[in-house]
């Protein structure tokens, strides 16, 4: 057992934090290899610490031994096949999301001993806006700059073509299920009406040189008048043409469309978020009441985290090139 220095209570040697007061437990030669991260699912409002697999250049080229793979998977509370998929993609991806920095450091140290190099990226990374991306509804374009409009009333944000550094493209998928149930005397409710809606739209985050918060364009919430004669009838066509046009005008900006190919691996650590909403009770007729509910599953936060991760490594590479 390990004694907590704060509350003086005994804790199992596998714990990182005190079971009673949450203080960090002291390490010694005996417990350093016994500690195991809890890696509990975080609430929506909690800020976590992400262990990110480093690019292939930072990891040995040989295949991970089966025993090491199973040990790493057990540490991360993942099926070995899921961890193998993450490693096979050979790109920076999350393998764990911890509630505390000490837990993330433990994961980093233990994975490093198995030959898997990682780094820690906090949700609340310096410069990250908690409000999310700046959503752009329309663009004005000339030879030197872009004029981004967030609302018809707000003044345009002026962005020089030379300021664009990264375009991250993905898909936003929202599944919405609406239920109307009749409450009965029995345990089970009778479903009166059920509807399911799915939206799937292309999204692009535009990162600029001096701002960490991206400008976001979504296909179904954008006025494509800036395309002029290139504008088509379908939003899915127009968003592709807009992205091509932006890349033509800013060829120096890095283009990343890897989100769709790694989305399955992201689900293991950054799953789509579910929101449950109740529309309340309604009296249908005397003695009969119904209740409505809405369940919405969205990958918007998943894409935002991945977009910020790509920008994190883009900025890191730029700093390394400047020092070289």
Segments from the language model and where they lie:
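Long, charge-rich boundary regions
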Residues: 32-98
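A cross-kingdom feature marking charged/low-complexity
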Residues: 44, 48-60, 106-140
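Short Cys/His-rich micro-motifs in 6-15 aa windows
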Residues: 22-32
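Phosphoinositide-dependent membrane-docking surfaces
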Residues: 141-148, 157-176
């Amino acid at each position: 057992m390990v004694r907590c220095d704060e509350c003086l209570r005994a804790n199992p040697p596998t714990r990182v934090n005190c079971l009673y007061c949450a203080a960090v437990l002291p390490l010694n030669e005996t417990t350093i290899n016994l500690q195991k991260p809890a890696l509990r699912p975080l609430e929506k409002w909690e800020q976590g610490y992400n262990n990110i697999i480093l690019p292939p250049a930072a990891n040995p080229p040989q295949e991970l031994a089966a025993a090491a793979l199973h040990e790493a998977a057990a540490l991360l509370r993942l099926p070995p096949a899921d961890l193998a998929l993450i490693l096979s993609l050979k790109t920076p991806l999350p393998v764990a999301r911890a509630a505390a920095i000490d837990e993330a450091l433990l994961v980093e140290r233990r994975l490093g001993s198995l030959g898997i190099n990682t780094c820690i990226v906090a949700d609340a990374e310096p410069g990250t806006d908690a409000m999310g991306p700046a959503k752009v509804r329309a663009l004005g374009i000339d030879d030197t700059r872009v004029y981004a409009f967030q609302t018809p009333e707000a003044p345009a944000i002026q962005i020089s073509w030379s300021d664009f550094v990264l375009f991250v493209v993905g898909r936003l998928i929202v599944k919405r299920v609406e239920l109307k149930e009749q409450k009965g005397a029995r345990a089970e409710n009778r479903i009166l009406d059920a509807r399911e809606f799915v939206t799937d739209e292309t999204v692009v985050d535009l990162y600029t040189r001096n701002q960490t918060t991206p400008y976001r364009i979504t296909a179904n919430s954008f006025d494509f008048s800036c395309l002029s004669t290139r504008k088509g009838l379908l939003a899915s066509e127009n968003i592709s043409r807009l992205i091509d046009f932006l890349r033509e005008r800013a060829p120096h900006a890095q283009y990343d469309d890897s989100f769709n190919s790694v989305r399955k691996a992201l689900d293991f650590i950054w799953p789509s978020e579910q929101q449950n909403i109740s529309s309340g009770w309604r009296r249908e007729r005397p003695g009969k009441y119904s209740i409505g509910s809405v369940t919405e599953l969205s990958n918007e936060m998943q894409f935002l985290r991945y977009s910020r991760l790509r920008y994190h490594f883009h900025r890191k590479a730029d700093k390394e090139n400047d020092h070289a």
